[in-house]
């Protein structure tokens, strides 16, 4: 049975009966949270996780939806005489169940890491051949999320079936525990994961590891352009490199199973503010998980205001669960120091009948850009209702909090501004159905039938608009 048939059938059932195509009932929207790897790598500890969770809560990010706290590699000291994984007592003196209890008591969800190989990527014991006992270890310790990597896999890759079977072993083991555990594959898109990932998992990485560069080429990330089927994914992949690889994959993702473009680099490295906005916007558009990769205890104000932009998060968490499609891509002569220069239009429908678009400027100069309704509603036929209607344009970044408000929140460790959205009190689905203005940006104009949406987009930047049918 083909993936396309499964996806369409599941989508039809979802619309008719309100059920989910998720293989385990989880991942109805892309996961949100924090992972230590991008900033801390192997420098992990109980104190780091619990202090980070406290900070995420204090500055309002938990109530915006960032609820998974994910412990990455380097947490174990090996296996005991029974073959059971053992947490490093120097790093986690009270054990993993203590970490889980603290997180759960504060309304977080706890994530851990292993690899579908003999070892993890950092050389710690992997789970290949130990799937059931390791799944039971995770369940026993209150784990809600497993990131499952691809290192030291003993050559068990090369065909989709080979990789599928290796990752399915852990999927089956997790399900046998009886504990709901979000299953996040990290096999770098190897062996066409987007075709089979949703059968056994809730998300799957589709490229090599991200790096905080907008479009810098790197020989360690050898595949470029639209090379989504990359036999050697590598690492140090730029934002644009990953985004362009993801362009054709949206059709294979949706409710219950998401393409994972890797953790967010907002607040990591030296990206400009426009680059960070573009990065966050495009991950939201394609329905990638929104996993913070930064040190939240040392976030700059501008990065915090990006992570807290509820009108953009609402695109990512839209109940319809449709990833954006890249409508067009044009190379331009205004190239940056790496010889890169392109512009793109992305568009996707939303659950309430709205449409969201991103005009992405990958050139080195601010430039005027436009989009016609025919491009925006790219699947509509001539004379359709979408093309014959007028649409109000809402800028999804226009209501971004300023640095003064962000600074007050970060310094006082408390959200006092009532205009900030709280998804714990009112979910994004509920807020959208109630037309909560904080989720819709600011109206800046209207585009009429046959007209053009015109704007100016900064270099390495994005214009992100929600279109609502004019009344």
Curated annotation (Swiss-Prot):
Record GO terms (molecular function): alpha-galactosidase activity
EC id: 3.2.1.22
Protein location: Secreted
Name of protein: Alpha-galactosidase
UniProt-listed InterPro entries: Aldolase_TIM, Glyco_hydro_27, Glyco_hydro_27/36_CS, Glyco_hydro_b, Glyco_hydro_melibiase, Glycoside_hydrolase_SF, Melibiase_C
Entry GO CC: extracellular region
Keyword Mitochondrion: no
Keywords carried by this UniProt record: Disulfide bond, Glycoprotein, Glycosidase, Hydrolase, Secreted, Signal
Keyword Secreted listed: yes
């Amino acid at each position: 049975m083909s993936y396309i048939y499964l996806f369409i059938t599941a989508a039809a059932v979802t619309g008719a009966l309100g059920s989910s195509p998720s293989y385990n009932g989880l991942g109805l929207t892309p996961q949100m949270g924090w992972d230590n790897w991008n900033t801390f790598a192997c420098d992990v500890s109980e104190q780091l996780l619990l202090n980070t969770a406290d900070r995420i809560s204090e500055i309002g990010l938990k109530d915006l939806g960032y609820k998974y706290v994910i412990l990455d590699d380097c947490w174990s000291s090996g296996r005991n005489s029974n073959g059971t994984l053992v947490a490093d007592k120097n790093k986690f003196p009270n054990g993993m169940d203590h970490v889980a209890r603290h997180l759960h008591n504060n309304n977080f969800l706890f994530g851990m890491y292993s690899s579908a190989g003999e070892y993890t990527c950092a050389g710690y014991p992997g789970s290949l051949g130990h799937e059931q006992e390791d799944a039971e270890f995770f369940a026993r310790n209150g784990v809600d999320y497993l990131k499952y990597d691809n290192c030291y896999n003993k050559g068990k890759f090369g065909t989709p079936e080979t990789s599928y079977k290796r990752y399915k072993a852990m999927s089956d083991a997790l399900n046998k525990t009886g504990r709901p555990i979000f299953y996040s594959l990290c096999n770098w898109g190897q062996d066409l994961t987007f075709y089979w990932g949703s059968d056994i998992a809730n998300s799957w990485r589709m490229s090599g590891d991200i790096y905080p560069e907008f479009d810098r080429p790197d020989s360690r990330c050898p595949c470029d352009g639209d090379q989504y089927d990359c036999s050697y994914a590598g690492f140090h992949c730029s934002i644009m490199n990953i985004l362009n690889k993801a362009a054709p994959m949206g059709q294979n993702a949706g409710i219950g199973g998401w393409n994972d473009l890797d953790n967010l680099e907002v607040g990591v490295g030296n990206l400009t503010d426009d680059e960070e906005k573009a990065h966050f916007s495009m991950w939201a558009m394609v329905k990638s998980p929104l996993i913070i990769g930064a040190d939240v205890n040392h976030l700059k104000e501008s990065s915090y205001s990006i992570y807290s932009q509820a009108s953009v998060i609402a695109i990512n968490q839209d109940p319809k669960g449709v990833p954006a499609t890249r409508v067009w891509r044009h190379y331009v002569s205004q190239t940056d120091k790496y010889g890169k220069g392109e512009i793109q239009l992305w568009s996707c429908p939303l659950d309430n009948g709205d449409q969201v678009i991103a005009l992405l400027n990958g050139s080195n100069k601010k430039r005027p850009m436009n989009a016609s309704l025919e491009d925006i509603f790219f699947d509509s036929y001539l004379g359709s209702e979408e093309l014959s209607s007028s649409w109000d344009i809402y800028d999804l970044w226009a209501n971004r909090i300023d640095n003064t408000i962000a600074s007050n929140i970060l310094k006082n460790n408390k959200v006092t501004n009532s205009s900030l959205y709280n998804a714990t009190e009112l979910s994004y689905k509920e807020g959208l159905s109630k037309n909560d203005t904080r989720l819709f940006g600011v109206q800046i104009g209207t585009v009429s039938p046959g007209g053009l949406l015109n704007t100016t987009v900064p270099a390495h930047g994005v214009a992100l608009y929600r279109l609502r049918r004019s009344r």
